[in-house]
């Protein structure tokens, strides 16, 4: 799998860069700080989502909110696209042959490892060589191999503080816990047996009590039946005797009442004879009363006749006056009608006059405004030219200020980068950079910044002055422009207003006669108004109403004559009678009549009481017979009641004892159930004892198998041979005096450190040399060959090799040697990517990518 292309969007100094790797040896060349290594950072971030820049936000280009990297890889079968979003892990995607197969950071990383067979630790230690780390693999060979082969992880597993020992300790703690559980298990078994024995004892007591309760309930039932029968008799006896006493009392009371009523009704016949005369006397009294009513009606009727005669006289007088006023009333109504007809035109006339006054006032104001505005019109054109010239000056000053600020920002960034440099090597170009040189660069930059700041202050002051002047001119220009528009508007309004005023004059002239006519009519109405109001007051007096009153007067006179005739008839009938003596006699008879009515009522009550006495005497006789039949004995009743209460008390005591036993039984059974559940739970836990013992033994065997003499030795042995074969095969393709190389990889010791191990080199002349005896060029060649050999052995699907600034610290001779090695290495790896600032390395390339920085952005161009 080779790298085809990478796209960087807002990544470090790259805003949007698309880099294609079309050759076997691809060289990325550019000045220090141009953004070359950022491309390698992008490849590493795409593959493993890792970097050495601290927080992920540090990868996003300054001034941007988001950033992303897309890496394209391919082989004969597949095309892979890896998309990484710098800020959001959920947006990461993996696309295979244009089909999405994974999403989110972790899933994408796992899938990349499966498909490409790339392990992060191996890749970063072998095929991706960071700046200054080319021969680090020779210096730290044992440590790097331990990391690559995961020997450190195996050692951590079997360490005395590792997870295997920790897990074994946990299992041993569980065994000790099971010993404690077994002791509790035996104690609980003993307790449950004791409780079960107590349950059996209580159940026997309960059965005995249930038999006793059953016998008692039977005895109580027998006595209760007898008592209920006697209770029934007693209730019947008490009911009858109570009723008998009540009836005897009622009988005695009735006899006393009968005797009293007989005395009170002795003179009833005599009273009836006297009262028969009362009706005749009453009729005479009614005639006296009727005469009084007729006399009163006669008096009232006479007064009404006199009043009605006066009213008729007034009516006749009012009607005559009404007839005199009617012509003036009709004249008044006619004038009112005429006023109503003229009113719309008169209102129109008033409205037109009001409109004319308003428009004349408006015209006066507009003429005044037009006079004032005409003075500002000539100034607009000259101000317009002045605004344009001042704006150009402002834009020029802003451009100069932006340029100065950009230069200040660049110098501050240089100072910041120099201040953060650790050691005496420039991180950008790799050249020597001692403290004196650093301070000199910083001093020069600060001096330049000071000069720029002074320039900036002058520009800002001048810009502020120009801006204030422009604002002032623009405000005046806007005011005058608005005044010109206002002047035009005022003139249009005046023209329209003059036309409207002329029209209003014409309309008012046509309606002028209406005003005079209205005034004349109002004067006539004023003269007739009093006559009109008097006529309206007399309008209620009509001839029809007068005729009705005359008819009514005739009827009243006729009625008066009838009353006089009836009064004369009654006077002849009542002649010689004394009304007061008559009324006294009637009153006495009325009192006797009331007394007679009371006697009649008492007579009826007396007869009813006599009937009730007969009935009560019969009831008393029957009740006495029923009492004799019952034969109730109070002593026998009390004897049965006492016996029943005693048996019920005994039954209640036994039932209480039974309830207490049942409560204790329920509690015991609940305890037994809970303890049995705990026993069953303990039995399940105790079954695990054998499994735990077996697990402890197996853990010891696993720990032993993972030790340095077993699994580690096996991994080293199988890997070592494969790497050596690959290494010697690659070296044979280089033009070196090395015949063969052997490696010694040692397992991790129990103390967590690697045992001694080494790389031995056999020369063509038969000598055996350690690494330290090799020349600089041979060390470079061996480092590259060893990295490729390890990668080929452990990552069979990886076909690229990346070198970041491999020429750093190399002299010209070694650089030339490195170029030859890179050319030779392409026989072992199909794709090599080299990042460098040395133009000499371009000689080895068949595809060149140039990177340069403009301002704070990196730009890429490709050369074939």
UniProtKB/Swiss-Prot annotation:
Keyword Coiled coil appears in the UniProt entry: yes
Residues engaged in binding ATP: 32-38, 131
GO biological process: one example: double-strand break repair
Keyword DNA repair: yes
The Zinc-hook domain, residue ranges: 380-478
UniProtKB keywords: ATP-binding, Coiled coil, DNA damage, DNA repair, Hydrolase, Metal-binding, Nucleotide-binding, Zinc
Cofactor binding note from Swiss-Prot or TrEMBL: Binds 1 zinc ion per homodimer.
Coiled-coil blocks: 176-319, 376-413, 440-697
Cited Pfam families: Rad50_zn_hook, SMC_N
Cofactor(s) named in the record: Zn(2+)
Positions of Zn(2+) binding: 426, 429
Record Gene3D superfamilies: 1.10.287.1490, Helix hairpin bin, P-loop containing nucleotide triphosphate hydrolases
Record-level GO cellular component terms: DNA repair complex
GO terms of molecular function: ATP binding; ATP hydrolysis activity; DNA exonuclease activity; zinc ion binding
Domain notes: The two conserved Cys that bind zinc constitute the zinc-hook, which separates the large intramolecular coiled coil regions. The 2 Cys residues coordinate one molecule of zinc with the help of the 2 Cys residues of the zinc-hook of another Rad50 molecule, thereby forming a V-shaped homodimer.
UniProt cross-references to PANTHER family, sorted A to Z: ABC TRANSPORTER ABCH.3
Family, similarity comment: Belongs to the SMC family. RAD50 subfamily.
Xref: HAMAP family: RAD50 (MF_00449)
Subunit structure: Homodimer. Forms a heterotetramer composed of two Mre11 subunits and two Rad50 subunits.
Function, as annotated: Part of the Rad50/Mre11 complex, which is involved in the early steps of DNA double-strand break (DSB) repair. The complex may facilitate opening of the processed DNA ends to aid in the recruitment of HerA and NurA. Rad50 controls the balance between DNA end bridging and DNA resection via ATP-dependent structural rearrangements of the Rad50/Mre11 complex.
Protein name: DNA double-strand break repair Rad50 ATPase
Species name: Saccharolobus solfataricus (strain ATCC 35092 / DSM 1617 / JCM 11322 / P2)
Gene that encodes the chain: rad50
């Amino acid at each position: 799998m080779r790298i085809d292309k990478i796209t960087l969007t807002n990544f470090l100094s790259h805003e949007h860069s698309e880099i294609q790797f079309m050759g076997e040896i691809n060289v990325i060349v550019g000045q220090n700080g141009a953004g070359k290594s950022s491309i390698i950072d992008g490849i590493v971030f795409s593959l493993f989502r890792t970097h050495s820049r601290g927080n992920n936000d540090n990868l996003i280009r300054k001034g941007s909110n988001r950033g992303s990297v897309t890496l394209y890889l391919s082989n004969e079968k597949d095309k892979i696209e890896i998309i990484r979003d710098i800020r959001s892990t959920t947006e990461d995607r993996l696309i295979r042959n244009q089909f999405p197969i994974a999403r989110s950071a972790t899933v994408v990383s796992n899938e990349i490892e499966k498909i490409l067979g790339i392990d992060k630790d191996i890749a970063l230690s072998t095929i991706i060589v960071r700046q200054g780390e080319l021969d680090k693999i020779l210096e730290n060979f044992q440590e790097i191999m331990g990391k690559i082969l995961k020997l450190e992880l195996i050692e951590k597993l079997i360490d005395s503080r590792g997870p295997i020992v920790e897990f074994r300790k946990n299992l041993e703690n569980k065994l000790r816990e099971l010993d404690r559980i077994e002791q509790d298990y035996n104690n609980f078994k003993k307790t449950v047996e004791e409780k079960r024995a107590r349950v059996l004892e209580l159940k026997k007591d309960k059965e005995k009590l249930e038999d006793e309760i059953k016998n008692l309930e039977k005895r109580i039932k027998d006595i209760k039946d007898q008592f209920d029968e006697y209770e029934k008799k007693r209730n019947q006896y008490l009911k009858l005797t109570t009723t008998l006493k009540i009836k005897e009392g009622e009988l005695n009371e009735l006899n006393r009442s009968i005797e009293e009523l007989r005395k009170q009704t002795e003179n009833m016949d005599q009273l009836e004879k006297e009262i028969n005369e009362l009706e005749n006397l009453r009729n005479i009294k009614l005639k006296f009363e009727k005469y009084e009513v007729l006399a009163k009606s006669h008096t009232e009727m006479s007064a009404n006749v006199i009043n009605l005669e006066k009213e008729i006289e007034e009516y006749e007088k009012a009607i005559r006056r009404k007839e005199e006023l009617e012509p003036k009333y009709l004249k008044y109504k006619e004038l009112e009608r005429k006023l109503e007809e003229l009113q719309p035109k008169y209102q129109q006339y008033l409205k037109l006059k009001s409109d004319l006054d308003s428009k004349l006032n408006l015209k006066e104001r507009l003429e005044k405004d037009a006079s004032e505005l005409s003075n500002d019109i000539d100034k607009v054109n000259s101000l317009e030219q002045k605004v344009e010239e001042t704006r150009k000056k402002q834009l020029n000053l802003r451009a100069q200020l932006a340029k100065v600020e950009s230069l200040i920002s660049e110098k501050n960034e240089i100072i910041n980068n120099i201040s953060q440099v650790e050691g005496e090597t420039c991180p950008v170009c790799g050249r020597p950079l001692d403290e004196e040189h650093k301070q000199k660069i910083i001093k020069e930059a600060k001096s330049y910044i000071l000069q720029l700041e002074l320039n900036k202050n002058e520009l800002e002051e001048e810009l502020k002055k120009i801006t204030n002047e422009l604002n002032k001119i623009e405000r005046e220009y806007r005011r005058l422009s608005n005044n010109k528009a206002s002047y035009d508007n005022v003139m249009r309004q005046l023209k329209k207003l003059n036309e409207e005023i002329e029209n209003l004059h014409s309309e008012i002239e046509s309606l002028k006669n209406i005003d005079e006519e209205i005034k004349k009519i109002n004067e006539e109405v004023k003269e007739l108004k009093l006559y009109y109001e008097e006529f309206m007051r007399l309008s209620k007096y009509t001839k029809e109403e007068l005729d009705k009153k005359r008819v009514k007067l005739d009827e009243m006179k006729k009625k008066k004559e009838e009353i006089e005739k009836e009064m004369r008839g009654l006077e002849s009938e009542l002649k010689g009678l004394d009304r007061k003596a008559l009324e006294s006699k009637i009153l006495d008879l009325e009192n006797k009549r009331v007394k007679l009515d009371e006697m009649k009522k008492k007579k009826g009550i007396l007869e009813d009481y006599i009937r009730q006495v007969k009935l009560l005497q019969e009831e008393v006789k029957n009740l006495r017979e029923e009492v004799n039949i019952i034969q109730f004995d109070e002593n026998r009743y009390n004897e049965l009641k006492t016996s029943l209460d005693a048996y019920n008390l005994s039954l209640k005591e036994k039932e209480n004892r039974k309830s207490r036993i049942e409560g204790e039984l329920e509690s015991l059974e609940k305890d037994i159930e809970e303890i049995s559940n705990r026993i069953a739970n303990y039995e399940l836990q105790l079954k695990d004892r054998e499994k735990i013992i077996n697990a402890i033994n197996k853990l010891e065997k696993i720990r032993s198998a993972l030790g340095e003499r077993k699994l580690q030795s096996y991994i080293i042995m199988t890997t070592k041979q494969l790497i050596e074969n690959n290494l010697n095969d690659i070296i044979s393709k280089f033009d070196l005096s090395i015949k063969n190389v052997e490696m010694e990889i040692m397992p991790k010791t129990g103390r967590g450190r690697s045992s001694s191990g080494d790389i031995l080199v056999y020369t063509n002349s038969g000598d055996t040399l350690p690494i330290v005896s090799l020349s600089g060029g041979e060390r470079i060649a061996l480092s590259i060959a060893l990295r490729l050999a390890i990668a080929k052995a452990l990552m069979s699907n990886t076909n690229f090799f990346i070198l970041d600034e491999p020429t750093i610290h190399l002299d010209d001779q070694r650089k030339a040697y490195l170029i030859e090695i890179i050319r030779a290495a392409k026989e072992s790896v199909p794709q090599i990517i080299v990042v460098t600032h040395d133009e000499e390395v371009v000689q080895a390339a068949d595809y060149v990518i140039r990177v340069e920085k403009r301002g704070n952005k990196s730009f890429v161009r490709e050369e074939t």
